[in-house]
Amino acid sequence: MSRIAKAPVDVLSGVEVTIAGQEVTVKGKNGTLSRVFNDAVEVVQEENQLKASPREGVANGWAQAGTARSLLDAMVIGVSQGFEKKLQLNGVGYRAAAQGKKLNLTLGFSHPVAYEMPEGISVETPSQTEIVVKGADKQLVGQVAANIRGYRPPEPYKGKGVRYADEVVRRKEAKKK
């Protein structure tokens, strides 16, 4: 039995929720998010709370309800406050510059990397070695940050590369003769 599924999701002020069958749409100041949930889960709105509960006779209903509750919580927080991921560039000559919906990266390749931001994601560069990815969709923000990090993941010997701001890179010692 899922403990997560038993806790209701509080709908914050300024957030509007619409339930149509298995599709839940959440509107807020940061935009609109919509998701179709598994048939094993029933989503119900009671006053200012959303509840995800399993349908009768479904084997993995509580597990699906816990997942649905977490997704609903992320949707409500996303449209009201938004999510952000911070990245840092470590390395000689590694730079980032945001130009509208495009992020230009210089990561030691023979060519600059131009990363086009998907719809609903914004990017800022407070300095040349910092990147801040923002958006309402938690999954998409994380995926964009992972894609940017994937161009040059941090290496363990010198620590060069693109890393998350809170990431700790375990360093290795160089080979000795």
From Swiss-Prot:
Subunit structure of this chain's protein: Part of the 50S ribosomal subunit.
MF (Gene Ontology): rRNA binding; structural constituent of ribosome
The protein's name: Large ribosomal subunit protein uL6
Organism per entry: Pseudoalteromonas atlantica (strain T6c / ATCC BAA-1087)
Gene designation: rplF
Claim: RNA-binding is one of the keywords in the record: yes
Organism classification: Bacteria, Pseudomonadati, Pseudomonadota, Gammaproteobacteria, Alteromonadales
A GO cellular-component term linked to this record: cytosolic large ribosomal subunit
Role this protein plays: This protein binds to the 23S rRNA, and is important in its secondary structure. It is located near the subunit interface in the base of the L7/L12 stalk, and near the tRNA binding site of the peptidyltransferase center.
Xref: Pfam families: Ribosomal_L6
InterPro entries named among the record's database cross-references: Ribosomal_uL6-like (IPR000702), Ribosomal_uL6-like_a/b-dom_sf (IPR036789), Ribosomal_uL6_a/b-dom (IPR020040), Ribosomal_uL6_bac-type (IPR019906), Ribosomal_uL6_CS (IPR002358)
Family: Belongs to the universal ribosomal protein uL6 family.
Keyword Ribosomal protein: yes
UniProt-listed PANTHER family: 60S/50S RIBOSOMAL PROTEIN L6/L9, LARGE RIBOSOMAL SUBUNIT PROTEIN UL6M
Assigned keywords, A-Z: Ribonucleoprotein, Ribosomal protein, RNA-binding, rRNA-binding
Gene Ontology BP annotations: cytoplasmic translation
